[in-house]
Amino acid sequence: MFPLTRPFRQGLATAALVMFTIMPTALVAMYAWRINRPGHIRDVEIELGRQLGLQVTLEAVRYPRPGELVYQGIVLRQEEPRGKGLIEIARAGLVRLVRGDRELTLHAENLKLSGESPRQALAQVGSLLQRSGLLPLDRINLAAPACELDLGHEGLRYAIGDLAGEFIADPANPTLRVAYRLAEPGSATRCELTLNRDRAANPVRSSLVLKTLEGLPLPARVLDVFFETADWLGQRAKVEGTLALSQAGGGDWDADFQGNLIDVDLATLVGKRFPHHQLSGTARIAVQRARWGERSSQQAGWREARGELSASQGTIGVDLLQALAREMKFRLSPRISRLDPRKTEVEFRSLGLAFHMQPSGEIHLAGALGNEFSPDTVLVNATAPLAFAPSGTASVHGLIKTLFPVADSPPGVMVPLTPQSRLLLCLPVAPEIAAKSGRTLGGN
């Protein structure tokens, strides 16, 4: 064995002491100085901002243990699409990050997500998806016990609980999946959101799917991002089902809905929008499919709607019954013609109507009252039928004339252009009818 001299052994001992005690201590001291110096938080903000493509501000950064970071008071801001300034899109009181093998897990507290409008919020998320290919990660997991979602309007603020999500950073098809509970009064429904961007398609295609999974139906105000539900469906209306949105390139979003609208107030749906007519009661609308999107020779609107409307115990105006018979070929029971002329409305026990509005503007109608009545019966009182579906097809043109009687319009005007009648521009009609309607509405 090679003999070691005393000086050599002393040198080895000194080197080992430096390597295993002094150097680690120096490295720890240097690391502690670096993360505690005044400029460290700013360095972290810049690095995070570079990775996310956002402006990041922090109140504090902590390192509880190796592989774990804690950001306090984090705020994310994004440049406006027109480049006029920065807008806040997210903030959290505390975010705890745990790193794994190309995986990141985030636990957020006091989380708030913001957008100036639903459309802008979608644009913000789309911008983040575009940059996802630059992330050095395959998966990001997110958990938050509570979250506030603010889409820029008093009626578009939602409280969300038990949020759990994952982002798959697939270069060809980045996908975000989120499960959550909408914390609305009287509702604890579990919901799911899936957002992806198919970069392999030409043009690039984005899709967003929202669905209810279990629990009671949601308050219909969750649809306020699309229309004012209280003004259309009533304050007590609820919704359940699946809403799928899709966008090709930079075009407008198409929509496809399947589900149920529950506790719809018919007085709000009809009487408030079409003051010439009366209809009351509480209805359920089972939507097999309703599609919204771009249409040839027409602006964006409804392309198709199929489902069933059912209601029990309500009233219907005699004028509305007569207009349905005159313009849409509904068949009325002889007892309607024998009503007292002074009577303006008729009580009904049940209303059941199956409908299919096609892209051509044709409407196929049938009864939906079950086996107790004939397949074409749509309205009954306590003892007998009151109205039957048309023998053939009806049309959106006839529906327009039913809702807005021509006799009430000025001479030469098919339908007066009002806030109520603008919805007609969203209905599918035959091209020749669309051209005539467009001139009439546009000329007012």
Q: Model segments located where?
A:
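Flexible beta-edge/linker motif
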Residues: 62-147
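Small-residue helix/turn framework positions
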Residues: 68, 73-75, 110-114, 141, ...
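Short, solvent-exposed mixed-charge patches
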Residues: 441-444
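Short, solvent-exposed loop/hinge segments that bridge or flank secondary-structure elements
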Residues: 148-171, 302, 321, 328-330
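Extended, helix-rich scaffolding/adaptor regions
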Residues: 131-138, 159, 170-175, 180
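N-terminal type II signal-anchor transmembrane helix
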Residues: 1-51
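A short, amphipathic edge element
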Residues: 50-59
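Short acidic, Gly/Pro-enriched loop/turn segments at secondary-structure junctions
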Residues: 100-104, 118-121, 150-158, 295-301
